[in-house]
Amino acid sequence: MPDLAAIVARNVRAERARRSWRQVDLAEKLGWSIGMVSETENGKRRIGIADMPNLCRALDVPLTDLLQGAEREDLIALKL
């Protein structure tokens, strides 16, 4: 079972790809470096709860889209 961070990373990568954006495009929208986006998408950088609103705005998706595939227990632990 993948952990929540891996699920969010996969969903961020999928949303970016769906828009045909390069990592640099998402980085510019977030005010992040390309390396931060790459590390986030590859699970090398944990996505903090504070990052979620910015990711949702940049990708123009609701939080539920980034959490799609998460286990109920993970969401309960986050109090979502």
Label for each model-derived stretch:
Residues R57, L67-L80:
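Short, charged recognition helix plus adjacent turn
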Residues V12, L26-A27, V37-T40, L66:
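Conserved hydrophobic/aromatic packing and binding residues within compact polymer-binding modules
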Residues A50-D65:
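DNA major-groove recognition helix of helix-turn-helix/homeodomain DNA-binding modules
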Residues R10-K29, N54:
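Short basic helix-loop element that most often maps to the first helix and adjoining turn
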Residues G31-I47:
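Recognition helix of helix-turn-helix/homeodomain-like DNA-binding domains
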Residues M1-I7, L75-A77:
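A detector for short, charged/polar N-terminal pre-domain segments
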